[in-house]
């Protein structure tokens, strides 16, 4: 006879690795990086909430700190929990979930009892029941697990909302105004549904269901029963009347709900805007002639006439040619004028008859004046500047000695040997001879012809000597005064540097010859 089978020895500790790995696959997960704020009980409840059958939480120290082993009833439940828990952010920590390896199975929890394992392997019907029970407890089958609603949905529950009305919409608007979160969620929903934004002007009111509510038609008059039909008993009459009422109410409700759903699904029709063609009216000549004046914007400002704003065109005519002769008349003219004055005085002493006799005829004829002399006088007057700079303006436009020391142009400044010719440098590009004549003309007496001829200005505008000038003055005294007053005067944004010229030769006088300064 065969020897009786000996029972397998089972240790008191954890079972072997073969007991942890069922033939269908592994069902133990290793959960890492659990939050330290949670206690061991809270960690165990968390993993059991995701369908774990048994949980073992390890200590908060060592290599496997803040970790836990979770055993699930089967491989599918373990895979589903892994997809839900892996990379889940919890209290600032990101969970890392993986299947437990063979080297880590020493720390895995032991099954609660051997009888449960035998029951699962022997009875597949009970295993299916457990699956169904776990299915109701998992997170995916809940109503809103993110908000804490984990109980399952009722499959028999259906919602049927009434169509929108003015009172319902008013209540919704009041709720939007009182609950800011609800208002924000409504805006999010409108954005997702690509609805127009409500931030613009008020849109047209869509057609409401209340406007299309059908009025109940009056019931048709009941015809009297024919005498041929025998009257029914009272019980049959009551049953038939109840059945007809039930059928009529059901049909009315169905028709009413169908109409409500059709109206709810209808989109609001926007009113069509009819564009009116504007016919431009032709203006008549009368209207164009009598154009009304535009009212003034304010009564404070007077109305300006075109003559006040624009220059009136002057009539073109024969222009008179005039010669502006200076007061300095030649000696010949003075002698003639003195003779005429003496003659007039003598005529006053003569009787009136003699004076009248002298005035009879074409009058007196004077000799023709010398035109060359008048033209020379005119040229001399053009060369003379009408105005010269004053001493106050020179002092005001000069820079101080402290500023001269800071500028590089005046660092190695030396006035030079005194003579009647000065040298000016550091001139701006826009400087012209008339500007220098305006400044240095105050040191020349233009009434003297010799001094006026000796006054000479040569401005260099090109080449290596650009921005420099030589000014010839009548004498050394005038040159020294000009150097003292004009040195450092700012002309067109640049201070002038005035020095005595090295070789000073005055301009030769054609009448008197060479003169030494």
Curated annotation (Swiss-Prot):
Residues 27-102, 420-503 form the RRM domain. It comes from the Eukaryota. InterPro entries: Nucleotide-bd_a/b_plait_sf, RBD_domain_sf, RBM40_RRM1, RBM41/RNPC3, RRM_dom. SUPFAM superfamilies: RNA-binding domain, RBD. Keywords: Nucleus, Phosphoprotein, Repeat, RNA-binding. Residues 115-130 have a biased composition (Basic and acidic residues). It holds the Pfam family RRM_1. One of its GO terms (molecular function) is U12 snRNA binding. GO terms for biological process: mRNA splicing, via spliceosome. The modification Phosphoserine is found at residues 21, 108. Residues 1-26, 106-130, 213-254 are annotated as: Disordered. Its main location: nucleus. Residues 231-252 have a biased composition (Acidic residues). The keyword Repeat applies. It is found in: Nucleus. Residues 217-230 have a biased composition (Pro residues). GO terms for cellular component: U12-type spliceosomal complex. The keyword ATP-binding does not apply. Participates in pre-mRNA U12-dependent splicing, performed by the minor spliceosome which removes U12-type introns. U12-type introns comprises less than 1% of all non-coding sequences. Binds to the 3'-stem-loop of m(7)G-capped U12 snRNA. Component of the U11/U12 snRNPs that are part of the U12-type spliceosome. Found in a complex with m(7)G-capped U12 snRNA. Interacts with PDCD7. This is RNA-binding region-containing protein 3.
């Amino acid at each position: 006879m065969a020897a009786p089978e000996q029972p397998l020895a089972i240790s008191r500790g954890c079972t072997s690795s073969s007991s942890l790995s069922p033939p269908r696959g592994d069902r133990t997960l290793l959960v890492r990086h659990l939050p330290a704020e949670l206690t061991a009980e809270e960690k165990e409840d968390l993993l059991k909430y995701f369908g774990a059958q048994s949980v073992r939480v390890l200590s908060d120290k060592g290599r496997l700190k803040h970790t836990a082993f979770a055993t699930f009833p089967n491989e599918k439940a373990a895979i589903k929990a892994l997809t839900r828990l892996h990379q889940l952010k919890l209290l600032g920590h990101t969970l890392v979930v993986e299947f437990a390896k063979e080297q880590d199975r020493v720390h895995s929890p032991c099954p609660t009892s051997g009888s449960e394992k035998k029951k699962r392997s022997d009875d597949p019907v009970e295993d299916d029941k457990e699956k169904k029970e776990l299915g109701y407890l998992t997170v995916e089958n809940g109503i809103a697990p993110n908000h804490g609603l984990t109980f399952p949905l009722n499959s028999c529950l259906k919602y049927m909302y009434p169509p929108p009305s003015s009172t319902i919409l008013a209540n919704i608007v009041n709720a939007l105004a009182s609950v800011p979160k609800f208002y924000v969620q409504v805006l999010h929903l409108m954005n997702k549904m690509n609805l127009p934004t409500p931030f613009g002007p008020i849109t047209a009111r869509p057609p409401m269901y209340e406007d299309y509510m059908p009025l109940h038609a009056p019931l048709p008059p009941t015809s009297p029963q024919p005498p041929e039909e025998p009257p029914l008993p009272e019980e049959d009459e009551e049953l038939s009347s109840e059945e007809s009422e039930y059928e009529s109410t059901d049909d009315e409700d169905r028709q009413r709900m169908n109409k409500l759903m059709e109206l709810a699904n209808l989109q609001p029709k926007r009113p069509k805007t009819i564009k009116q063609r504007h016919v431009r009216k032709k203006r008549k000549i009368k209207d164009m002639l009598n154009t009304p004046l535009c009212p003034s914007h304010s009564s404070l400002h007077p109305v300006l006439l075109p003559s006040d704003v624009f220059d009136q065109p002057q009539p073109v005519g024969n222009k008179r040619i005039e010669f502006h002769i200076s007061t300095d008349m030649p000696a010949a003219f003075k002698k003639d004028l003195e003779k005429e004055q003496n003659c007039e005085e003598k005529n006053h002493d003569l009787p009136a008859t003699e004076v009248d006799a002298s005035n009879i005829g074409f009058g007196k004829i004077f000799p023709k004046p010398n035109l060359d002399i008048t033209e020379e006088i005119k040229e001399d007057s053009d060369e003379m500047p009408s105005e010269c700079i004053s001493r106050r303006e020179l002092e005001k436009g000069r820079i101080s000695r402290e500023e001269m020391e800071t500028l590089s142009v005046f660092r190695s400044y030396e006035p030079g040997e005194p003579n009647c010719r000065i040298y000016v440098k550091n001139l701006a590009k826009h400087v012209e001879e008339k500007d220098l004549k305006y400044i240095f003309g105050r040191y020349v007496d233009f009434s003297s012809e010799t001094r006026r001829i000796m006054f000479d200005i040569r401005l260099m505008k090109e080449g290596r000597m650009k921005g420099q000038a030589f000014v010839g003055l009548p004498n050394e005294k005038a040159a020294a005064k000009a150097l003292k007053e004009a040195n450092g005067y700012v002309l067109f944004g640049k201070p002038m540097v005035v020095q005595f010229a090295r070789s000073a030769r005055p301009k030769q006088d054609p009448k008197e010859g060479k003169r030494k300064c």
